[in-house]
Amino acid sequence: MNFSGKYQVQSQENFEAFMKAVGLPDELIQKGKDIKGTSEIVQNGKHFKLTITTGSKVVQNEFTLGEECEMETLTGEKVKTVVQLEGDNKLVTTFKGIKSVTELNGDIITSTMTLGDIVFKRISKRI
């Protein structure tokens, strides 16, 4: 399955609790909670380029499935991780105690990030 496309956030659950748990300042949490950000994914075989735009903040990450890479997190921190493909429609990675699963079903991408007992879920639709 090819993940390439541009997606806009439709809904999210537990944004504030998750962002507080990862150390984002309250001011940025309040600014970001109502923004319907976009994600653009360009997939070329096992190589992915991901651009996430939330208001004026843009985060770009590139990775190749199964290879260690450096990624920028939501808080701006750089972490080393490995992204794996599960089945043909799930991208899975773990960093700093956070498990991130991005699942594509048709035109809907569901991103789930779990830290301890806090589960942040974001649903985006292809635009």
Curated annotation (Swiss-Prot):
Among the GO molecular function terms of this UniProt record, one is:
fatty acid binding
Q: Specify the superkingdom.
A: Eukaryota
Gene Ontology BP terms = fatty acid transport
Q: List residues, modification Phosphoserine.
A: 11, 39, 56, 100
What is the annotated localization of this protein? Cytoplasm
Q: Name the Pfam families on file.
A: Lipocalin_7
Residue numbers carrying Phosphothreonine: 51
N6-succinyllysine: modified positions = 31, 36, 46, 57, 78, 90, 121
- Alphabetical list of InterPro entries matching this protein: Calycin (IPR012674), Fatty_acid-bd (IPR000463), ILBP (IPR031259)
* Primary subcellular site in the record, as a coarse category: cytoplasm
Sorted alphabetically, the keyword list is: Acetylation, Cytoplasm, Lipid-binding, Phosphoprotein, Transport
Q: Which CDD domains match?
A: FABP1
Q: Which residues carry this modification: N-acetylmethionine?
A: 1
What is the protein's quaternary organization? Monomer.
Query: Which PANTHER family does this UniProt record tie to the protein?
Result: FATTY ACID BINDING PROTEIN
The family assignment reads: Belongs to the calycin superfamily. Fatty-acid binding protein (FABP) family.
Per the record, the domain comment is:
Forms a beta-barrel structure that accommodates hydrophobic ligands in its interior.
Q: What does this protein do?
A: Plays a role in lipoprotein-mediated cholesterol uptake in hepatocytes. Binds cholesterol. Binds free fatty acids and their coenzyme A derivatives, bilirubin, and some other small molecules in the cytoplasm. May be involved in intracellular lipid transport.
Q: What is this protein called?
A: Fatty acid-binding protein, liver
Q: Please tell me the species this chain comes from.
A: Sus scrofa (Pig)
